[in-house]
From Swiss-Prot:
One Gene Ontology MF term: manganese ion binding
Keyword Metal-binding recorded: yes
Cofactor: Mg(2+); Mn(2+); thiamine diphosphate
Keywords: Magnesium, Manganese, Menaquinone biosynthesis, Metal-binding, Thiamine pyrophosphate, Transferase
Protein name: 2-succinyl-5-enolpyruvyl-6-hydroxy-3-cyclohexene-1-carboxylate synthase
Assembly and oligomerization: Homodimer.
Cofactor binding annotation: Binds 1 thiamine pyrophosphate per subunit.
Family of this protein: Belongs to the TPP enzyme family. MenD subfamily.
Pathway: Quinol/quinone metabolism; 1,4-dihydroxy-2-naphthoate biosynthesis; 1,4-dihydroxy-2-naphthoate from chorismate: step 2/7; Quinol/quinone metabolism; menaquinone biosynthesis
Gene designation per UniProt: menD
BP GO annotations: menaquinone biosynthetic process
Length: 509
C-alpha cells in the first residue's frame, strides 16, 4: 500500500503537469499535500486560512489565466466550503481543481473526527477518488471542473520533502466544437454577446449588444436599445447569441421573440435556438439602413443615460461611469454581481484594450473580493520583469464587499484597487418588483438591509490603504491618484439608493 507521503508526492507531481498556481489551506489531513506542493519549484503556492475564500481566490486566478488552478483542503466541512466556487466554476466553464484530503475508508462510519462523505459532495462534478498512485492515471484533465479526493492514512508525514523533480507541463484544450453555421447578412442581424463570448470571424461588422465581460465590438449597440428593437417595424430578423448573456431583461425578452442562432464552445446550450455552432460562414451583405438604425438607437440610449446621470445625485451608476472613464488600455477590471455589472453595461462597457471579468456563471455575489485578488495576482505574475504590474480595478457594492471581506486576509497583490459603491444596503432591490411603494413597510428589514458598517475601519484592520469619495469629482480624483501608484487600495464611494427606482424608470424607453 502506498504511504501518505508517497501518495502526496505523486499527487503534487500530477498537479504540476497541469497547473501553475495552487491555493492551500492549513489542516492536518492535507499536511502531506501542502508540504509536497511547497517543496516544488514549478508551482506558485498561495495560502489562505478560509477554504471558501481560498476556492474563490483560485477561481479568480483561473478566470484570468484561463488555466486550471487547484485549491487543496483538509477533510470535513472544509471541503463543503468550496461548494460555492465549484458551482460558479461549473456554470461559467472556468477551469478549477478541488483537491480534498480524506480519511481512509476504515474510519468512515466510525464517528471519526472531521470525517464526512466527500465523494460526490459537489453535484456539479463527479469525484475522482484516489487511494493509490495508480488511481491518478485515470484522472482526465480535459474538463473544466475537477474534484480529486485523496484518502490519506497515518503516518501523514515522515521527513521534510526534497525539491520535487520538474515535469513537463500539459495544456489541455477544453472546448466543444459544434461545427459551422451559415448566416445570411442580408437579414437584419443583431449579435448579443455575453460572458464567455469571443471575437467571431465573420461577425466583426454586425451590430452587437455586448455585456461588459464580452470582447468590445466594432459596432457596439447600447443594451437599452433592445427596448426599441421590440417594435416590429425595426425588430431584428435574426439574433446571434455568442456566449452566455444574462444581464438585461429587455435583451432576454427580445431573444424569446426572434429566431436565434447560438454560438458556443461549451456543452451548455440554453433556450430554443434554431441552430447551434462554434463558427460561422456568412453570405450576403449587411444592409446599411440596418446599420444606421442600430447606430441611431444606440446613440439615443447612450444620450439618455448621460441625461439621467446629470439629473440625479451620486449613485452606483455614477460610480460605474467614473470607473469606465478612468480605465486605460492594459488595465484589468473585475465586476461584482448585482448592480455594478449592470451599471457598467449601461455606461459603455466593454472597453477596448481592457480585460473585464465578472462572475456570471451562477451570478452570485459571494467570493467577489477573493476573485478580484486572484485576478490581480495573475496579472501581477504575467511579467516578472515589470517595474510595476498593470493595474487591476474591482468594482462592487457594499453588501458584496462585506460578504467576502475575509478575502482581504493573506498575501496581497500590489496592483489592485477595490472600488466599493456603498449605498448602505442592497440597492438592486430598489429597482425590482419588491421595491414598489406597497412593499416599503417591510422593504428595509428584508431587502434594503442597511448595515452602517465603517469601511474605513475594516481597511485599517486589514492594513489596506483607504480613500473616501462622497461626490463624483472626489471619486474621479481618487481613481486618478491610484492609477500611477503601486499598492492595494480601497476606495469607498458613498452613494445613495433612494433614487435608483426613479433612475430605472427614467431609463425605460
Amino acid at each position: 500500500m502506498t504511504s501518505s507521503p508517497e501518495l502526496a508526492r505523486a499527487v503534487a507531481a500530477t498537479l504540476a503537469r497541469h497547473v501553475t498556481d495552487v491555493v492551500i489551506c492549513p489542516g492536518s489531513r492535507n499536511s502531506p499535500l501542502s508540504l509536497e506542493l511547497i517543496a516544488r519549484d514549478d508551482i506558485r503556492v498561495h495560502t489562505r486560512i478560509d477554504e471558501r475564500s481560498a476556492a474563490f481566490l483560485a477561481l479568480g486566478l483561473a478566470r484570468s489565466s484561463k488555466r486550471h488552478v487547484a485549491v487543496v483542503t483538509t477533510s470535513g466541512t472544509a471541503v463543503a466550503n468550496c461548494a460555492p466556487a465549484m458551482i460558479e466554476a461549473a456554470y461559467s466553464h472556468t477551469p478549477l481543481i478541488m483537491v480534498s484530503a480524506d480519511r481512509p475508508e476504515r474510519l468512515h462510519g466510525t464517528g471519526a473526527n472531521q470525517t464526512i462523505e466527500q465523494r460526490g459532495i459537489f453535484n456539479v462534478v463527479d469525484t475522482d477518488h484516489v487511494v493509490d498512485i495508480t488511481d491518478l492515471n485515470s484522472i482526465s484533465f480535459a474538463r473544466n471542473v475537477i474534484h480529486i479526493n485523496v484518502a490519506l492514512d497515518v503516518p501523514l508525514v515522515d521527513v521534510l520533502p526534497e525539491v520535487g523533480d520538474p515535469v513537463e507541463r500539459v495544456r489541455e484544450v477544453i472546448e466543444v466544437d459544434h461545427g459551422e453555421v451559415v448566416l445570411n447578412l442580408n437579414e437584419r442581424i443583431l449579435v448579443v454577446a455575453g460572458d464567455e463570448a469571443w471575437e467571431v470571424p465573420g461577425l466583426e461588422d454586425v451590430p452587437t449588444i455586448a455585456e461588459p465581460s464580452a470582447p468590445a465590438p466594432y459596432h457596439p449597440v447600447h443594451p437599452l436599445a433592445a427596448q426599441i428593437f421590440a417594435h416590429k417595424e425595426i425588430k431584428p430578423e435574426h439574433i446571434v447569441v455568442v456566449g452566455h448573456p444574462t444581464l438585461h431583461r429587455a435583451v432576454l425578452s427580445l431573444l424569446a421573440d426572434v429566431p436565434v442562432t447560438v454560438l458556443t464552445k461549451t456543452d451548455t446550450i440554453t433556450g430554443n435556438p434554431q441552430a447551434v455552432g462554434s463558427r460561422v460562414k456568412v453570405t450576403g451583405e449587411l444592409d446599411k439602413r440596418w446599420l444606421q438604425i442600430c447606430e441611431d438607437a444606440s446613440t439615443l440610449c447612450a444620450d439618455r443615460v448621460k441625461e439621467v446621470l446629470e439629473g440625479h445625485g451620486f449613485t452606483g451608476l455614477h460610480v460605474a461611469a467614473a470607473v469606465a472613464d478612468t480605465m486605460a488600455v492594459g488595465d484589468t477590471l473585475f465586476l461584482g454581481a448585482s448592480n455594478p455589472v449592470r451599471d457598467a453595461s449601461l455606461v459603455g462597457m466593454p472597453l477596448g484594450g481592457v480585460d473585464i471579468f465578472a462572475a456570471r456563471g451562477a451570478a452570485g455575489i459571494d467570493g467577489t473580493v477573493s476573485q478580484a485578488v486572484g485576478v490581480a495576482l495573475d496579472v501581477q505574475h504575467r511579467d516578472a520583469t515589470a517595474i510595476r504590474a498593470d493595474r487591476t480595478v474591482a468594482l462592487m457594492g457594499d453588501v458584496t464587499f462585506l460578504h467576502d471581506v475575509g478575502g482581504l486576509l493573506g498575501a496581497r497583490p500590489e496592483n489592485l484597487t477595490i472600488v466599493v459603491a456603498n449605498d448602505d444596503g442592497c440597492g438592486i432591490f430598489e429597482t425590482l418588483e419588491i421595491g414598489a411603494p406597497e412593499f416599503r413597510p417591510s422593504f428595509e428589514q428584508a431587502f434594503g438591509t442597511p448595515h452602517g458598517v465603517h469601511i474605513e475601519a475594516i481597511a485599517q484592520a486589514y492594513g489596506v490603504n483607504y480613500l473616501r469619495a462622497e461626490t463624483l469629482p472626489e471619486l474621479i480624483e481618487a481613481l486618478i491618484d491610484t492609477t500611477d501608484s503601486a499598492g492595494f487600495n480601497i476606495i469607498e464611494a458613498v452613494t445613495t439608493r433612494s433614487t435608483r427606482r426613479d433612475i430605472d424608470k427614467a431609463l425605460t424607453l
